[in-house]
Amino acid sequence: MSKVCIIAWVYGRVQGVGFRYTTQYEAKKLGLTGYAKNLDDGSVEVVACGDEGQVEKLMQWLKSGGPRSARVERVLSEPHHPSGELTDFRIR
């Protein structure tokens, strides 16, 4: 499998519902590095790097709604090339 990185923006009721922490748990379970960060517009930015198949599994999880307490309306994503080395999956 090839290594890939994506950046995704998750919209809906995704702040104040444990979304970043649950995303971190799922990403670590899949062996991914990156981060989840709240944005000022109420969305969450997710950067995920790792094996292509595992990144795709995280994207499917995000698109399926994430944690039960969240309500995901849409997910936009594109390939990403982080400027530094990501060694863990963190909350920002």
Swiss-Prot record:
It comes from the Bacteria. The active site is at R20, N38. InterPro entries: Acylphosphatase, Acylphosphatase-like_dom, Acylphosphatase-like_dom_sf, Acylphosphatase_bac, Acylphosphatase_CS. Its EC number is 3.6.1.7. It is an enzyme of class 3 (hydrolase). Disulfide bonds join C5-C49. SUPFAM superfamilies: Acylphosphatase/BLUF domain-like. Residues 5-92 form the Acylphosphatase-like domain. GO terms for molecular function: acylphosphatase activity. It catalyses: an acyl phosphate + H2O = a carboxylate + phosphate + H(+). Keywords: Disulfide bond, Hydrolase. PANTHER family: ACYLPHOSPHATASE. Belongs to the acylphosphatase family. This is Acylphosphatase. It comes from Escherichia coli O6:H1 (strain CFT073 / ATCC 700928 / UPEC).
